[in-house]
């Protein structure tokens, strides 16, 4: 079988910030909102990213 992937060093917030830097504010906000939609909950990290992605 396949081995488990290696642990990732980037946090969710860092990932959203990278998306903001690479693709812009709108993409980062949509990316963050879709994360909450996929996990069916609104977590504090998602709210922080939505509030801060345009700063």
Curated annotation (Swiss-Prot):
TM segment ranges: 24-40
Compartments, record wording: Cell membrane; Secreted, Cell wall
Pfam families linked? CYSTM
Q: Which GO terms describe its molecular function?
A: metal ion binding; metal ion sequestering activity
Annotated keywords: Cell membrane, Cell wall, Membrane, Metal-binding, Secreted, Stress response, Transmembrane, Transmembrane helix
One GO biological process term is: detoxification of cadmium ion
Q: Which GO terms describe its cellular component?
A: extracellular region; plant-type cell wall; plasma membrane
Per the record, the major location class is membrane
Q: How does it sit in the membrane?
A: Single-pass membrane protein
> Which InterPro entries would you find in this protein's record?
CYSTM1_HM_Tolerance, CYSTM_dom
PANTHER family per UniProt: CADMIUM TOLERANT 3 (PTHR35470), PROTEIN CADMIUM TOLERANCE 1 (PTHR35470:SF12)
Family designation? Belongs to the CYSTM1 family.
Its function, per the record, reads: Confers resistance to heavy metal ions (e.g. cadmium (CdCl(2)) and copper (CuCl(2))) by chelating them at the plasma membrane of root cells, thus stopping their entry and reducing their accumulation.
The name on file for this protein is Protein CADMIUM TOLERANCE 1
Species of origin reads Echinochloa crus-galli subsp. caudata
Which taxonomic lineage does the organism of this UniProt entry have? Eukaryota, Viridiplantae, Streptophyta, Embryophyta, Tracheophyta
């Amino acid at each position: 079988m396949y081995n488990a992937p290696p642990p990732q060093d980037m946090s969710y917030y860092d990932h959203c910030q990278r998306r903001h830097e690479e693709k812009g504010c709108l993409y980062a906000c949509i990316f963050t909102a879709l994360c909450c939609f996929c996990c069916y909950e609104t977590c504090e990290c998602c709210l922080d990213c939505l509030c801060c992605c345009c700063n």
